[in-house]
UniProtKB/Swiss-Prot annotation:
Cross-referenced InterPro entries: PSI_centre_PsaK_sf (IPR035982), PSI_PsaG/PsaK (IPR000549), PSI_PsaK (IPR017492), PSI_PsaK_bact (IPR037101)
Protein name: Photosystem I reaction center subunit PsaK
GO biological process: photosynthesis
Residues passing through the membrane, by range: 20-39, 61-79
Domain of life: Eukaryota
Bilayer topology: Multi-pass membrane protein
């Protein structure tokens, strides 16, 4: 397979910038807030050493930030294709 063909199929993405970082941080925070209230069975794994988050442990944090990164990557690709972030 020709490498130029593969490279032509990859969409143009914006380089890392403050705008890209803010989109990713916002998506992760929204996923954490949504997961805090949406996860029914909580507190089964190890806890995180942050006060005020009883019942929200390491498994919940990893799950919500994983979802936040998926949403953030899709948002960054979409916003850069539309031209709202550069």
């Amino acid at each position: 397979m020709d490498i130029l063909f593969v490279l032509s199929a990859v969409p143009h993405t914006s380089p890392w910038s403050t705008q890209v970082a803010m989109v990713m941080i916002t998506c992760n925070l929204l996923a954490i807030v949504a997961g805090r209230y949406a996860i029914k069975v909580r507190g089964l794994g190890p806890s995180i050493p942050v006060s005020g988050v009883e019942g929200f442990g390491l498994p919940e944090l990893l799950a919500t930030t994983s979802l936040g990164h998926v949403i953030g990557a899709a948002s960054i690709l979409g916003l850069s294709n539309v031209g709202l972030i550069s």
